[in-house]
Amino acid sequence: MLSYDRILNFVIGARGIGKSYAMKKHPIKRFIKHGEQFIYVRRYKPELKKIGNYFNDIAQEFPNHEFKVKGRQFCIDGKLTGWAIPLSAWQSEKSNAYPMVTTIIFDEFIRERDNSGYIPNEVDALLNLMDTVFRTRENGRCICLSNAVSIINPYFVYFGLVPDINKRFNAYKHILIEIPDSKDFSDERRKTKFGQLIDGTEYGEMSLDNEFVNDSDVFIEKRSKNSKFVFSIVYKGMRMGVWVDTQQMLLYLTTDHDPSTKNVYALTADDLEEGMILVSNYKKNYHIRKLCSAFMNGQLRFDNQLMRTIGYEMFKKMRVQ
């Protein structure tokens, strides 16, 4: 993953596969060899209560070095090595300087059950922290770690990322998504008593099989060859296309759209640009009313998980029910 040299990296893998351990080991080696420092990030301050145990599982790999945690500072051989920072307090870091930090590790960047635990404007918060730490330096990288909960999260939605979950590496211009293969690890874990206990359960799908248990394939379908483009919608900066297949009586909400169309609807004032039409009440706009009707009648399809998540959020905002 590191060989791709992307500034922002996401690693989503089965629980216990060793994501956190590997990303703990890397900055330790960089500090010992090059004097580079690191920052360990969790979402909220209470999640750092046990940070004093950070080195407990890895210290034995470096028997000639002394590891200590002082408050929220990491030390190796008596020298400051890194910091533990809650993302929720990112604004307090804006005036701090970290000229020797080359690695930011954000652990558990995806919430395991719902979106209620994300901090307001969380992606902007992380980007602000990266900006504060790296400044204009080109040698920094942020690595975000998570269990396989959902391929859809505020970060992928923000950047419009739709990774192929069957590929280990999905490389973009400045971003890399790694979804490690955990088959060998899963086979061994299934032999344990706990592995046998969770095998076949939803928890087992996430922990053993690296399946995205919070994602649903309901209403996800690639648009048909007979579908025709009708109009575009802009929501939270993302432009989406709406297509119709009159033979199947289906509408499709997709990432594909016709950039030359004059039928472009903005659902918020923030998205409104010249040449667009602002829709404040879906019942008063023919196209949007038809889209909402298709959704309510089960006749709307989404071409991927990203479109499904954004679509459901969009309809909720319009109070479609």
UniProtKB/Swiss-Prot annotation:
Gene3D superfamilies listed in its UniProt record: P-loop containing nucleotide triphosphate hydrolases (3.40.50.300)
Short name of any one Pfam family annotated for the protein: Podovirus_Gp16
Reactions this protein catalyses: ATP + H2O = ADP + phosphate + H(+)
Enzyme class: hydrolase
Spans annotated as ATPase: 1-196
Keyword vocabulary terms for this entry: ATP-binding, Hydrolase, Late protein, Nucleotide-binding, Viral genome packaging, Viral release from host cell
InterPro entries documented for this protein: P-loop_NTPase, Podovirus_Gp16
Residues at which ATP binds: 13-20
Annotated stretches, region: DNA-binding: 222-321
EC identifiers of the protein: 3.6.4.-
GO molecular function: ATP binding; ATP hydrolysis activity
Function text: ATPase required for the genome encapsidation reaction. Part of the active packaging motor via the binding to the packaging RNA (pRNA), itself fixed to the head-tail connector at the unique portal vertex of the prohead. Binds and supercoils the pre-formed, unit-length DNA bound to gp3 to produce an initiation complex for DNA packaging. Provides the energy to actively pump the viral DNA into the prohead. Approximately one molecule of ATP is used in the packaging of 2 bp of viral DNA.
Known partners and oligomeric status: Homopentamer. Interacts with the packaging RNA (pRNA). Part of a DNA-gp3-gp16 complex.
Domain notes: The N-terminus contains the ATPase activity and the C-terminus (CTD) binds DNA. The CTD is likely a vestigial nuclease that has lost its hydrolytic capability since Phi-29 is not a concatamer that neads cleavage.
Entry similarity comment: Belongs to the phi29likevirus gp16 family.
Protein's recorded name: DNA packaging protein
